[in-house]
Amino acid sequence: MSFNNQSIDQLHDLLVKKEISATELTKATLEDIHAREQAVGSFITISDDMAIAQAKEIDDKGIDADNVMSGIPLAVKDNISTKGILTTAASKMLYNYEPIFDATAVEKLYAKDMIVIGKANMDEFAMGGSTETSYFKKTNNAWDHSKVPGGSSGGSAAAVASGQVRLSLGSDTGGSIRQPASFNGIVGMKPTYGRVSRFGLFAFGSSLDQIGPMSQTVKENAQLLTVISGHDVRDSTSSERTVGDFTAKIGQDIQGMKIALPKEYLGEGIAPGVKETIIKAAKHLEKLGAVIEEVSLPHSKYGVAVYYIIASSEASSNLQRFDGIRYGYRTENYKNLDDIYVNTRSEGFGDEVKRRIMLGTFSLSSGYYDAYYKKAGQVRSLIIQDFEKVFADYDLILGPTAPTTAFDLDSLNHDPVAMYLADILTIPVNLAGLPGISIPAGFDKGLPVGMQLIGPKFSEETIYQVAAAFEATTDYHKQQPKIFGGEN
């Protein structure tokens, strides 16, 4: 029996009433995963035995009636450390790495008796927008297997969209949760920078990275964010703000709420079908009582250039630790120490990772630091100021999550600039450290279109309020791909 059409609240009710056990739910979820995995390719590792053992432990002590996540399985992106489960970052460099510790976010999952059922495929070290740079496999879009699932959290998104799991964790450095959520027609939240501990997340861009939830519905997303949020002394960038219940405002009306629609978000490069869908979604929010007005974010057009200087610079520093000496892959082709360093990194990293290391090393090098990295930091400040000006008068910003729907597999592999531009609408949110969500807003030629809602720092509750109001009065989130039993 499959339970993948049951909401988290419904599953919790069944578990509390003992109509199903955590073990039965876990086994059913594993059946759904294996039945769809060949078609979608969401997972690098499926931890059958460990997940069932966890579920049996939870059954033995009993489901906690006050904990909606008790006994619920989920997928975790493979750049988030999981003790006893391979954590590869989809790289040859870490193809056999089994951590001896859990990331803080994973510790919080276990504290709520959640079950990590497997590790989701991704772009290598989270560098990519299509999940095609993975060392292990390519993941297919849940709606059309000839399309990409987005990236870098493509496996996490496809697993939810295809009905393999209800929930997953991803990470977002420049859109890596929101863009695949858009491409697969699910909900994906990039929280405020500092909202979720980065301890145990393999670092890509340390001033940009955030772990976040991916889900079938807005409420489930808020429920999972409530679990993983909170201060962590092991992450100096994590916020000390008290974490409440992110579902608190769900169900409240949005009458009188002011929402900005930047003209740059519907300009050049936005596919006509995507633009039409977002305009329709904005009008729907107006019918619900929101006030939608056009604004300008004039420096957002520089976001991609700024991002690829800053993120690549941070990556070149973070990835220095992978040298063939301490852990991970080591070349067998060496005569001296220099050979170990050079050949290990040449053989262990894929082309996209090496490209970004070179970009970052160049940007930080003597004679170029001021011209590139320092200037990028200055423009980043201008992008932040643009958002601050808008949020002085508006509650939220809306726009498309991505300029297009999911593109063909292998279509942009040899055009990195075109691939980078796919994140033009999500990158500024990371540069400013803001929270942003993608929710299903419609379809263009049979493929999902996501609407992005962006708020000031620590405004996740308000974002969920508006997202849930839209979701409750539309049926886009209820439509499913064929692999999940839908008609599309």
From Swiss-Prot:
<keyword id="KW-0067">ATP-binding</keyword>
<feature type="active site" description="Acyl-ester intermediate">
    <location>
        <position position="176"/>
    </location>
</feature>
<dbReference type="GO" id="GO:0030956">
    <property type="term" value="C:glutamyl-tRNA(Gln) amidotransferase complex"/>
</dbReference>
<comment type="function">
    <text>Allows the formation of correctly charged Gln-tRNA(Gln) through the transamidation of misacylated Glu-tRNA(Gln) in organisms which lack glutaminyl-tRNA synthetase. The reaction takes place in the presence of glutamine and ATP through an activated gamma-phospho-Glu-tRNA(Gln).</text>
</comment>
<keyword id="KW-0436">Ligase</keyword>
<keyword id="KW-0648">Protein biosynthesis</keyword>
<protein>
    <recommendedName>
        <fullName>Glutamyl-tRNA(Gln) amidotransferase subunit A</fullName>
        <ecNumber>6.3.5.7</ecNumber>
    </recommendedName>
</protein>
<dbReference type="GO" id="GO:0006412">
    <property type="term" value="P:translation"/>
</dbReference>
<comment type="similarity">
    <text>Belongs to the amidase family. GatA subfamily.</text>
</comment>
<dbReference type="GO" id="GO:0005524">
    <property type="term" value="F:ATP binding"/>
</dbReference>
<feature type="active site" description="Charge relay system">
    <location>
        <position position="77"/>
    </location>
</feature>
<dbReference type="Pfam" id="PF01425">
    <property type="entry name" value="Amidase"/>
</dbReference>
<keyword id="KW-0547">Nucleotide-binding</keyword>
<dbReference type="InterPro" id="IPR004412">
    <property type="entry name" value="GatA"/>
</dbReference>
<dbReference type="InterPro" id="IPR020556">
    <property type="entry name" value="Amidase_CS"/>
</dbReference>
<dbReference type="InterPro" id="IPR000120">
    <property type="entry name" value="Amidase"/>
</dbReference>
<dbReference type="InterPro" id="IPR023631">
    <property type="entry name" value="Amidase_dom"/>
</dbReference>
<dbReference type="GO" id="GO:0050567">
    <property type="term" value="F:glutaminyl-tRNA synthase (glutamine-hydrolyzing) activity"/>
</dbReference>
<feature type="active site" description="Charge relay system">
    <location>
        <position position="152"/>
    </location>
</feature>
<comment type="subunit">
    <text>Heterotrimer of A, B and C subunits.</text>
</comment>
<dbReference type="InterPro" id="IPR036928">
    <property type="entry name" value="AS_sf"/>
</dbReference>
